[in-house]
Amino acid sequence: MIPYCYHTHTYRCGHAEGEDEEYVLEAIAAGVRKLGFSDHIMLPNFSQPNVRGDYKELEGYLSSINFLKEKYKEKIKIYLGFEAEYDETFESYYRSLLEQHKIEYLLLGQHFSFANGRIIDYFGHVHEKEQLIKYKNLVVKAMSTGLFSVLVHPDLYMSAYDKFDATAKMVAHEICKASLKYNVPLEINLGGIRRGIVKVGEEKRYLYPYKPFWKIVAKYGCRVVIGVDAHSPKNFTTNEYSIALSWIRELGLKHDQDIIINENRTKIDEKL
């Protein structure tokens, strides 16, 4: 049984399937008590087909999830949010969504960075130390803003980097320090487990989660959550959750099953 899921996508991103209500019904059937929708954020004046929905789809997304929140309030607690990459260009937009209570939370998923009109992809394309450092700098800066409730798949940078060298370890340590300093939990992502064991360099492993990274997390005692990263209603009834739980037990990770997903939004409200 999966008690909570705050990492759920919709068909609008172009690479997920199923209607919004199907996710709710399957989550209820799987025993989920708290469900957060967090589709890839729609950005104004920015198009990224098959990665995120166009900005014109924003209101439809908000309306649909708010409708389902009310319809199923006796059966499941539904939260409304987005998964977003950090970039200073979009910080005021993210803040306005939270301040205006259009959404309840943001997940930090640093799949990309944006520079001089170029998109730098961190999923499966990080091979140089400079890219690791850029990734680390972005996620640490993002956590410092107070906008994000969880850093999802924090070990994404290891999806193609084929050695856990001094630079990769330094990135892990700095992410953990920031997680503690800014009170941002780290997510063990089931999406990487669903992809199965693959060969990266000389290792056969998941692209993520990457166990050596999580051994460092355990030493720091950072709060940890599990993210289904649902891209299909069927993802709630597969066995990846039990694998993540076994890692938590094996490594002695601090599993926060009672996370208040929108606690950072409350902090933002208090500053107004």
Can you describe what each PLM-predicted range is?
Residues 1-88, 92-93, 98-100, 162-170, ...:
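An N-terminally biased module of ancient metal coordination in phosphate/nucleic-acid-related enzymes
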Residues 1-2, 31-34, 74-80, 101-104, ...:
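Short, well-ordered coil/turn segments that N-cap beta-strands
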Residues 1-10, 20-25, 158-159, 163-272:
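Charged catalytic cores and adjacent phosphate/nucleic-acid-binding surfaces used
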Residues 17, 43-44, 107-195, 207:
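Divalent metal-binding pocket/active-site signature
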Residues 37, 108, 227:
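Short beta-strand and adjacent tight-turn residues that come in two discontinuous sequence segments
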Residues 50-54, 121-127, 202-204:
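Short glycine-enriched, charge-decorated loop/helix-capping segments at active-site entrances
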Residues 60-63, 133, 137, 212:
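Short, contiguous clusters of charged residues that form electrostatic/catalytic patches at enzyme active sites
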Residues 96-97, 120-122, 270-272:
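Short, surface-exposed amphipathic charged segments that create phosphate/polyanion-binding patches used
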